Curated annotation (Swiss-Prot):
Keywords: Cell outer membrane, Cell wall biogenesis/degradation, Lipoprotein, Lyase, Membrane, Palmitate, Signal
Family per record: Belongs to the transglycosylase Slt family.
Region forming the signal peptide: 1-16
Pfam families: Mltc_N (PF11873), SLT (PF01464)
Name recorded for this polypeptide: Membrane-bound lytic murein transglycosylase C
Function: Murein-degrading enzyme. May play a role in recycling of muropeptides during cell elongation and/or cell division.
Localisation per UniProt entry: Cell outer membrane
Gene Ontology cellular-component annotations: cell outer membrane
Keyword Manganese in annotation: no
């Protein structure tokens, strides 16, 4: 809730920064997905007012984006492509703004709850165990743990790798840092103990949990989506989160801060997989067919999976039980009404195969 309230606070600030009239935001909207989407749309619009057309960049499931300096400097980590881009439109000493943002980004910790992605406050705490440690090597080929090394690398980048481009009325200065080739594996390794714990607790395959995490967030603990799915496994508070709380006999739904904790997120996401596997889709007898259904349901819901086969849920389960697993896979990847869910099954299934081979 803290970060949602921050959006309410900064919306008028962003508008004033860009010279636009303040627009009132109804706090009641934040209680549902539509409200969050409206707030995010406003946030994106206000970033456009500051940075210009075609320069809107906001955090996503596989993109960490943090603004500082009255929204004139930003750090972007693309966890899919493996690139960090630090940019500024500051007109006074842009190199200094870039340098500070580089240092802060390289040394940030892995606690998403401590960083507000929607504020321009530089609330990034220098960590003794940086999240990017081992994922970035400096110009001497060394990993970066200490502030002095990050500062030396920042100086090197600003002096030798500075780029400049013009976009609209702005001159944008930037530097780009490549993550190491196996950055995905390094992030996955961080969470293996948590994955193993959740796997044993709920009876869900480790390989499936890892495949879901890779597909949902590329192991980005700061992951957010336009529909307010949160964290490594992109758990939605009022759907999967609520179901898990009900399973535990708890009222309500998990908080945003709860789901931004990596261990809580993995535990909740895995618990939801177990609910799908054992309850909603537990009548599917073949374990491979059930796994295909569970994967698709994690993305689009159990009801939509069963409706692919029949509008009657009991009959749908019977139809699936009369099919070969390969036919179930073919049906879900070609006849599910949502293209995202069709592609999701393909992606997760392929990722799971790679984790099973390790």
């Amino acid at each position: 809730m803290k970060k949602i309230l921050a959006l309410l606070v900064i919306a008028p600030l962003l508008i004033s920064c860009s010279g636009k009239k303040n627009t009132e935001v109804n706090e009641a909207l934040v209680k549902d997905t539509n409200g969050f989407e409206i707030l995010m749309g406003q946030f994106a619009h206000n970033i456009e007012n500051i940075w210009g057309l075609n320069e809107v960049l906001i955090a996503g499931p596989k993109d960490y984006v943090k603004y500082t300096d009255q929204y004139q400097t930003r750090s972007h980590i693309n966890f899919d492509s493996g690139a960090i881009t630090i940019e500024t439109i500051a007109t006074t000493d842009p190199a200094a703004h870039l340098r500070q943002a580089i240092i802060s980004t390289l040394l940030m910790g892995d606690d998403p709850g401590s960083i507000d992605l929607y504020s321009d406050v530089n609330d990034i705490q220098i960590s003794k165990e940086p999240f990017l440690y081992g994922q970035v090597l400096d110009n001497k080929g060394a990993p970066i743990r200490w502030e002095w090394r990050a500062a030396h690398f920042a100086d090197y980048l600003v002096q030798t790798k500075l780029q400049k481009r013009t976009s609209g009325l702005h001159v944008i200065y930037s530097v780009t840092i490549q993550l190491v080739p196996n950055h995905l594996d390094k992030r996955a390794h961080k969470y293996l103990p948590m994955v193993r714990k959740a796997s044993e607790k709920y009876g869900v395959e480790e390989s499936l949990i890892l495949a879901i995490m890779q597909t949902e967030s590329s192991f980005n603990p700061y992951a957010v989506s336009g529909s307010d799915a949160l964290g490594l496994m992109q758990v939605v508070q009022h759907t999967a989160g609520k179901d898990v709380f009900q399973m535990r006999g708890k009222w309500g739904k998990p908080s945003r801060s709860y789901l931004f904790d990596p261990e809580n997120n993995i535990d909740t996401g895995t618990a939801y997989l177990a609910i799908l596997q054992n309850n909603y889709l537990g009548g599917i007898q073949n374990p491979t067919s059930r796994r295909y259904a569970v994967i698709t349901a994690y993305n689009g819901g159990a009801g939509s999976v069963l409706r692919v086969f029949s509008s009657d849920r009991t009959r749908a389960v019977g139809i699936i039980n009369g099919m070969q697993p390969g036919d179930v896979y073919q049906t879900l990847t070609t006849k599910h009404p949502a293209s995202e869910s069709r592609h999701y099954l393909v992606k997760v299934n392929n990722a799971q195969k790679s984790y099973r081979r390790r």
